[in-house]
Amino acid sequence: MSIEVVEVRPHERHFGVYALKFEDGSERLATRNLTPGKRVYGERLVKWGGAEYREWNPYRSKLAAAIANGIKFVPIQEGTHILYLGAASGTTPSHMSDIVGERGLIYSVEFSPRVFREFMEKLVDQGRRNVVPILGDARFPYQYAHYVKGVDVAYIDVAQPAQAKILADNADYFLKPGGYVMLVIKAMSIDVTAPATETFKQEINTLKERGFEILETVHLEPYDTAHAMVVARKR
Ligand SMILES: C[S@@+](CC[C@H](N)C(=O)[O-])C[C@H]1O[C@@H](n2cnc3c(N)ncnc32)[C@H](O)[C@@H]1O
């Protein structure tokens, strides 16, 4: 039998993020479900105060891991337009879709046709109208330049080498002046022989060289080994 939720309250720092409190005193992150009754990855749904919330699992979503680890600033709120590179089957994009609401947009780029089909089934076919699915390769932003309008945030989680470069190339095309980038660094996919901190430094240097001011870096352990999240702003 699952334990009961005894309180749902807004997160003290992040817009559109909630804390679910359980009867045993434990707490979990959640977002308010934009498509009530529908799940994306088997997450728990909680009805509270006339709304429905989706539990946000930090072991499944690196943005949730960064929030659970105390990231201070997430540049996402109601109405934010986001370019999401490496959308996979939509776990993190679905929570962003909850947060930005009907006035926001998540341009979601994924290059694997099989995974993209899952994304379509789980998000688009389920009625998330603020998601724009793009089957494309993030290394070649010109391929989808005609679909994407200026964005407030560019987010990357492609688990491939040269992520900072790919992110900066996309920012050159699509990021509005003063916009933000969020970079998930997976040390192993960049250089398996280098220690994680070395790899993190290299990727951060690439962002600095491309004109970004680094605002924050958060490690994602214990949720993800050798991963970090970097938030930066275009100077
Ligand atoms: C770690 S998963 C992303 C998980 C997702 N961000 C989430 O939190 O829900 C990485 C995804 O990036 C995709 N990917 C890798 N290289 C890519 C590229 N160059 N362009 C687009 N997608 C890419 C992979 O197919 C995979 O689905």
UniProtKB/Swiss-Prot annotation:
UniProt-listed SMART domains: Fibrillarin (SM01206)
CDD domains: AdoMet_MTases
Annotated InterPro entries: Fibrillarin, Fibrillarin_CS, SAM-dependent_MTases_sf
First-level EC class: transferase
Top-level taxon: Archaea
Molecular function GO labels: histone H2AQ104 methyltransferase activity; RNA binding; rRNA methyltransferase activity
Kinase recorded as keyword: no
Listed EC numbers: 2.1.1.-
Annotated Gene3D superfamilies: Phosphorylase Kinase, domain 1, Vaccinia Virus protein VP39
Signal peptide boundaries: none
Keywords (A to Z) from UniProt: Methyltransferase, RNA-binding, rRNA processing, Transferase, tRNA processing
Annotated positions binding S-adenosyl-L-methionine: T91, T92, E110, F111, D137, A138, D157, V158, A159, Q160
Gene Ontology BP, a term: tRNA processing
One Pfam short name: Fibrillarin
Subunit structure: Interacts with nop5. Component of box C/D small ribonucleoprotein (sRNP) particles that contain rpl7ae, FlpA and nop5, plus a guide RNA.
Function: Involved in pre-rRNA and tRNA processing. Utilizes the methyl donor S-adenosyl-L-methionine to catalyze the site-specific 2'-hydroxyl methylation of ribose moieties in rRNA and tRNA. Site specificity is provided by a guide RNA that base pairs with the substrate. Methylation occurs at a characteristic distance from the sequence involved in base pairing with the guide RNA.
Family: Belongs to the methyltransferase superfamily. Fibrillarin family.
Listed NCBIfam families: PRK04266.1-1, PRK04266.1-2, PRK04266.1-3
Protein name listed in UniProt: Fibrillarin-like rRNA/tRNA 2'-O-methyltransferase
Name of the gene this protein is made from: flpA
